[in-house]
A protein has these predicted regions:
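Helix-to-loop junction immediately C-terminal to a conserved catalytic motif
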Residues: 51
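Conserved ABC transporter NBD signature motif
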Residues: 59-67, 76
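Conserved ABC ATPase "signature" region
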Residues: 112-130
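Conserved ABC ATPase signature
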Residues: 134-138
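Catalytic Walker B motif of ABC-type/P-loop ATPase nucleotide-binding domains
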Residues: 159-162
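H-loop/switch region of ABC-family ATPase nucleotide-binding domains
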Residues: 194-195
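Conserved beta-strand-loop-alpha-helix hinge in the C-terminal portion
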Residues: 214-234
């Protein structure tokens, strides 16, 4: 039994726009999965369905075999953390450490455990020099790491990262690779939406390719990235990122 499942999921926004149709994904703990596709393919909607920020119009989401139907977003977030593409949509504390520690304290985790999680999160994200800073005084890139650290401190079973490589330099990309591989080695499921094919090739064993609200292909990353016709069909509007030294 897969740990996270989307079974024939559909989602329609109140405006009437249908964002995903018949999406099915099964994922196990320890996997590293990339979700790729052009803008508007349904990637972010699919990710938000995974952690309860959105509820399926039709179909079902299951975590460890249990349907999320009727469960609150906060309950689902204990198991599945979603990190927004834009950190400013997520940060609300005026101190980095307060932001990172908010979720475990909200869930009344004991202080000894909170402190252990904070040390781990800060170490993985390289934020130690900035823990007493106002996150809004940090660069956009570092603010993204603040939100990632907050997710790590929450200690969910599943991490869903939305475009984590956007606006990152080479140092940031290397840091992200280390984080993803460290979490996977601990048995966490890591799902990442990205347009960065180099990052996908270097870090993910499995890739889900989406186009026009559907899944086109779900396979080993090397098979997908070497399928020229699939890349042309699904990623025609995606350009390679510019990496800065």
């Amino acid at each position: 039994m897969a740990y996270l499942e989307l079974r024939d999921v559909y989602f329609e926004y109140p405006s009437g726009h249908v964002a995903v149709e018949g999406v099915s994904i099964s994922a196990d703990l320890g996997e590293k999965i990339a979700i790729i596709g052009e803008n508007g393919a349904g990637k972010t909607t699919t990710a938000k369905l995974m952690n309860g920020l959105l509820k399926p119009t039709k179909g079902e989401v299951l975590i460890n075999g249990v349907s999320t139907k009727g469960k609150t977003t906060a309950t689902i977030a204990r198991k599945v953390a979603y990190v927004f593409q834009n950190p400013d949509d997520q940060i609300f504390n005026q101190e980095v450490l307060a932001e990172i520690s908010y979720t475990p304290r909200y869930f009344k985790v004991d202080e000894e455990t909170v402190n252990k999680r904070l040390k781990k999160a800060v170490k993985l994200t390289g934020l130690k020099p900035y823990i007493n800073e106002n996150p809004y005084n940090l660069s956009y890139s570092y603010r993204k790491f603040v939100t990632i650290a907050a997710a790590i401190a929450a200690d969910p079973d599943v991490f869903v990262f939305d475009e984590p490589t956007a606006c990152q330099d080479r140092h940031g990309i290397r840091l992200l690779s280390g984080i993803i591989n460290a979490l996977s080695s601990e048995g966490k499921l890591v799902i990442t939406i990205t347009h960065d094919m180099e990052f996908v090739a270097e870090n993910f064993d499995r890739t889900v390719c989406m186009a026009d609200k559907h899944i086109l292909m779900d396979d080993k990353t090397n098979r997908i990235l070497t399928d020229d016709s699939l890349m042309e069909l699904s990623l025609i509007h995606i350009s390679e990122p510019t990496r800065h030294s």
